[in-house]
Curated annotation (Swiss-Prot):
Annotated residues for binding of heme b b562: H37
Family membership: Belongs to the cytochrome b family.
Cofactor requirement: heme b
Name by which UniProt lists this protein: Cytochrome b
Presence of keyword Transcription: no
Oligomer and partners: The cytochrome bc1 complex contains 11 subunits: 3 respiratory subunits (MT-CYB, CYC1 and UQCRFS1), 2 core proteins (UQCRC1 and UQCRC2) and 6 low-molecular weight proteins (UQCRH/QCR6, UQCRB/QCR7, UQCRQ/QCR8, UQCR10/QCR9, UQCR11/QCR10 and a cleavage product of UQCRFS1). This cytochrome bc1 complex then forms a dimer.
Species annotation: Pomatostomus superciliosus (White-browed babbler)
Note: Heme 1 (or BL or b562) is low-potential and absorbs at about 562 nm, and heme 2 (or BH or b566) is high-potential and absorbs at about 566 nm.
Cofactor, how bound (note): Binds 2 heme b groups non-covalently.
Heme keyword on record: yes
GO annotation, biological process: mitochondrial electron transport, ubiquinol to cytochrome c
Membrane-spanning ranges: 1-7, 31-52, 67-79
Record localization: Mitochondrion inner membrane
Lineage: Eukaryota, Metazoa, Chordata, Craniata, Vertebrata
A GO term, aspect molecular function: ubiquinol-cytochrome-c reductase activity
Length: 79
């Protein structure tokens, strides 16, 4: 969905909202693509947080190198 959204998105601050409005109103099923993308991203981050919670529960933070790599990956995902 991100590739389809990126095809219609404009990063210019004066046109960004207009490009989202164009996508939702003028692109066929643009509203559906936008909603699928938003819900999919939310579900992805919920899965990430559950994975972190599982690591905390089972004490994976004791393995410092692996835990630090996981923290770096989490920060990279959020950037």
């Amino acid at each position: 969905t991100a590739l389809l959204l990126a095809a219609h998105y404009t990063a210019d601050t004066s046109l960004a909202f207009a490009s989202v409005t164009h996508m939702c109103r003028n692109v066929q099923f643009g509203w559906l693509i936008r909603n699928l993308h938003a819900n999919g991203a939310s579900f992805f981050f919920i899965c990430i947080y559950l994975h972190i919670g599982r690591g905390l529960y089972y004490g994976s933070y004791l393995n410092k190198e692996t835990w630090n790599i996981g923290v770096i990956l989490l920060l990279t995902l959020m950037a």
